[in-house]
Amino acid sequence: MIATKNIRGLLVTNAFLKNGKFVEHYEWLREAAKQQEIRLDLCDNAMLHAIYGMESDEAKLAAYSFIIFWDKDIRLAKWLERYCQKRGIPIFNTPEAVAACDDKSETFRLLTEAPEEAFSLIPSVVAPLTFAAVGYTDVDFLSSIEKQIGYPMVIKECFGSFGWQVYLAKDRKEALRYTKKLAGTPFLYQKFIAASAGVDVRLQVVGTEVVAAMKRRSKTDFRANLSNGGQMEAYEASQEECDLAVRTVLALGLDFAGVDLLFASGEDKPANMICEVNSNAHFRNIAECTGVNTADKIMQYIKRVLEGKQERNHRG
């Protein structure tokens, strides 16, 4: 338990994501921390380095009682974790949890292996590994994937955000084109969920609570992402949907996340299929359509954890 009076935390971000929507989120978190009487300093991954075999940057961390890792630089996160574990300093979210969400194949693997849990996942096949300099010299493997998934099929890079690395292959010709284009890049072949084409729900989870939810819809694209032209509206999530989102966050060991669900059985029934999970989900849009500031919820949660009033989420 830490006395939170005049406490300092460190918000670690990416040095190369400096456009307005990223910086705005950092400022929202800092302002939310201020409301909790917590000083939250900003540091990016060009200011703090994972260093081995010589004097490191550990001295820069001495003043902090917790870290919010709002980046996907997993190598840096693991270096930070080594330092923090020795001193009992919590990292929100943990490097393992961030990595579990960053790699979409890893997300599905962990959810499949979650003890005593059953999650409905998009039927997916992980593309076989090749290298950019080699390419796919033989694509016979695609025949068995076609039989398992059918067309149209979604081809999704394992590492990506805002729907930008997600493609729809209507036939074998398009599947081959994307397959060859992505040689050397980890990706998935996924079943196209027609009942949820262009529509999904985002549930924002903090701790064990769904704090806000919105429905996203696109009339022109199979992806519902707002960055691709989708529209948003506040959504009243059912208890079933909330339970699913919270179970997902717990299974992945996340403190907070955006959980995206698909309407696998149609919009007249609860969204029941996990699409993906974002450990660093942007929250401006969901704030605009629901009035809920997720930054406030995150900092309230962190303060409760630091004060020993709430247990953290742990995988398993």
What are these regions (language model features)?
Residues 222-272, 297-315:
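A long amphipathic alpha-helix within ATP-dependent nucleotide-binding catalytic cores
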Residues 4-10:
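Extreme N-terminal starter segment of soluble prokaryotic enzymes
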Residues 159-248, 252:
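Phosphate-binding site of ATP-dependent enzymes
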Residues 153, 211-212, 257, 273-275:
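Protein kinase-like catalytic core scaffold
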Residues 15-132:
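Conserved N-proximal alpha/beta basic substrate-recognition cap immediately N-terminal to
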Residues 278-291:
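Glycine-rich phosphate/pyrophosphate-binding beta-alpha loops
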